[in-house]
Structure formats: structure tokens, C-alpha cells
Curated annotation (Swiss-Prot):
Organism placement in taxonomy: Bacteria, Bacillati, Bacillota, Bacilli, Bacillales
Function: May play a role in the degradation of type I rhamnogalacturonan derived from plant cell walls.
Keywords: Cell membrane, Lipoprotein, Membrane, Palmitate, Signal
Keyword Signal: yes
Organism in which the protein naturally occurs: Bacillus subtilis (strain 168)
Name of this chain's protein: Putative lipoprotein YteS
Length: 167
């Protein structure tokens, strides 16, 4: 009898240990690529963490972006626009159908059969931004997108919508 209890206890502990090692955060995972000053990065990280479970900020290197996407990390990416244009392929992104219709974006595709326009990424214009009570200045245009494998689409759409609001 004690051997069964020990075995069951080992299985339960192993399952709990493996579950705690999961790389997926409970909330949304935001990945930002930027060459901004550390103080600005911290403001953005604190503001985004109020909506997200995890925020990672990396230097703006194309190779790191491809690594993160290949590893299926992140529910939403915010990258310098010139960096995004090198990776721009609508098949890799979820459509941003939840955004208000007044949002415009240069990143759209048109369905040849229906003529319907689909937004797959948005431009976040440089300038003063506000997110969850934190203000910060973007010195270059950024692009935001949701990769096709992302699980937290609704939360990601809300964050993108906040960042694209004119202030």
C-alpha cells in the first residue's frame, strides 16, 4: 500500500514540476524589439505588464525576431517598421479583424474573390503615446502584429488598439 502511495505521490510531484516549467505565461506575452533608451523601455514594460503576463524587450536585430517567431514565442510583437518590412508576409500573421474600422494600416491584403480588405499588421506612428497611465515618446514608426500561432488574440488586439490611438 505504501508503495502505491509513494508512486502516486511521485507522479503528482512530477506533473506539478513539469507544469511549472512551461514556457507559456499565464497572460499574454508581448515581445518588443527596440533601440530606445532604457528608461523608455522600462516605462513601456511596466505599462504593458498591466495587460500582459510577460513582456520581453530585445535589441532590434532581425535574427532575434526570426528566432522568437520560429520558437513560437509571443502573442504580440512590436517592432521597428523597417525591421517588420523585411519579414512582411501576410500568411504569417493573424488578421486584425477586431480593430475598429477607422483604424487604417498600410499592411493589408485583399481577397481576390470577395474584394474584402484584411488588416494583418498596424503602424504605430512615432510621437507621444500613453498606455495604462504611462506616457512615453516613440522616436520612430513601429509595426505591431499577432503571429498566426498566438493564443491570446483578444488581449493582443486590445493592446494594439491602445497603442494606435491618437493622443
Amino acid at each position: 500500500m505504501t508503495k502505491r502511495i509513494r508512486t502516486a505521490l511521485c507522479v503528482i510531484v512530477s506533473v506539478l514540476f513539469l507544469a511549472s516549467c512551461s514556457s507559456r505565461p499565464d497572460g499574454m506575452h508581448v515581445i518588443l524589439f527596440s533601440d530606445m533608451q532604457a528608461g523608455v523601455q522600462e516605462k513601456i514594460k511596466k505599462a504593458a505588464e498591466q495587460n500582459a503576463g510577460k513582456v520581453d524587450i530585445f535589441p532590434a536585430f532581425q535574427e532575434k525576431l526570426l528566432t522568437e517567431i520560429t520558437a513560437h514565442e509571443g502573442d504580440v510583437f512590436i517592432v521597428p517598421e523597417d525591421m517588420f518590412q523585411a519579414y512582411d508576409d501576410p500568411e504569417n500573421f493573424q488578421p486584425l479583424n477586431g480593430l475598429p474600422p477607422e483604424k487604417t494600416s498600410p499592411y493589408t491584403t485583399v481577397n481576390k474573390k470577395t474584394g474584402e480588405k484584411t488588416i494583418y499588421a498596424v503602424q504605430i506612428e512615432k510621437g507621444k503615446k500613453q498606455l495604462n497611465g504611462y506616457s512615453f515618446q516613440l522616436n520612430r514608426d513601429m509595426a505591431a502584429f499577432i503571429p498566426v500561432y498566438a493564443e491570446k488574440t483578444e488581449e493582443a488586439l486590445q493592446l494594439i488598439s491602445q497603442l494606435t490611438e491618437a493622443r
